[in-house]
Amino acid sequence: MPRFLPEPPHRHGNPATTAVVLVNLGTPDAPTAPALKRYLKEFLSDPRVVEIPKPVWWLILNGIILNIRPKKSAAKYASVWMPEGSPLRVHTERQAKLLKGLLGQRGHHLTVTSAMRYGSPSIPEVLAHLKAEGAKRILLVPMYPQYAASTTATVVDEAANWLTKIRNQPEMRFVRNFHDHEGYLAALEKSVRQHWQTNGSLGDNDRLLISFHGLPKRSLDLGDPYFCECHKTGRLLAERLNLKPEQFQICFQSRFGKAEWLQPYTAPTLHEWGSKGVRRVDVICPGFVADCLETLEEIAQEGRDDFLKAGGKEYHYIPALNEDDAWIKALADIAEQHLGGWSTKTAFDPHALETSAREAFKFGARA
């Protein structure tokens, strides 16, 4: 088997284009048990996601989880599925389209597309397509505001693995995080204030719950900065909203398994608040820039049930940033910052490219 993937012949006179790729977690292709089984197998087989000895985890995953979870998860996905497909994929594709338009308005000549770490379109598929189209410079933007080894790092891993198979590699850059980016925080603040304009501000007996996806506590103990970056995002957002400490709480959702995860946990907090007389809860999930199963089902549906059944009176989920104009502007600012030094504002001159190719051939270059 060849060490490298087949490479098209080098062609003189082709423009060196630039591409931006928005990368999110991933999604099954359909809200069905078979599709969920394929997706979960890929996702939960990533050693960045599950740090358990491989032989032990293989038995648990293939013997138990993949025989139980797909059917249950399929029903949950079906409850949030959009006519166009999975919410996460739909919103990410829309974000890429809007980002391309805004960067174009700012004078950039580049391609903007999206990829998924698990499922399709995969990172290798998208990178291979961009390379075939002539991309020589690629900026990957993992859509995770807070860095974690199980999210951002595995995107870098997958892209780097693809690069090891490429003879003629493009330049590649990665955005590490943007948890304290001014534009991102401003977009979050705007979404909360717009919600309050419609539903009223928080009263004395109301709370804002700032919920992030959870990780095993072991990740923090081993040096992962995710917990600290989540707290910084939550604290800065609360400051912008002029909230007192007793008016908000940072929590972590989606606990899986019996191990201790980052705390406090979202679901028990909602239950406790409802049982202790908190009247209203507004929930925002800053770690998700596009709505998905974890926000639309776990928070918007299950969270509401937990709080109201425990005695709460009013519950609101504040949607993810999705296609909000302030967020797309922030995303463009983030992309521009990391595109620095790459020539993206100069239109290609076909005559100059043709002349360059002609000169190369004159001095013996291969056609």
From Swiss-Prot:
Question: What's the catalysed reaction?
Answer: heme b + 2 H(+) = protoporphyrin IX + Fe(2+)
Which molecular function terms from Gene Ontology are attached? Answer: ferrochelatase activity; metal ion binding
Q: Does the keyword Cell membrane apply?
A: no
- What Gene3D superfamilies does this protein's entry cite? 3.40.50.1400
One Pfam family from the UniProt entry?
Ferrochelatase
Query: Where found?
Result: Cytoplasm
Q: In which pathway does it act?
A: Porphyrin-containing compound metabolism; protoheme biosynthesis; protoheme from protoporphyrin-IX: step 1/1
Q: Name one GO biological process term.
A: heme biosynthetic process
Its GO CC terms are: cytoplasm
List residues binding Fe cation: H213, E294
Keyword list (alphabetical) reads: Cytoplasm, Heme biosynthesis, Iron, Lyase, Metal-binding, Porphyrin biosynthesis
Q: What EC identifiers does the entry list?
A: 4.98.1.1
HAMAP family in UniProt: Ferrochelatase
Which PANTHER family did the record assign? FERROCHELATASE, FERROCHELATASE, MITOCHONDRIAL
Q: What does this protein do?
A: Catalyzes the ferrous insertion into protoporphyrin IX.
In which family does this protein belong, per the annotation?
Belongs to the ferrochelatase family.
Q: Output this protein's name.
A: Ferrochelatase
Question: Which species expresses this protein natively?
Answer: Dechloromonas aromatica (strain RCB)
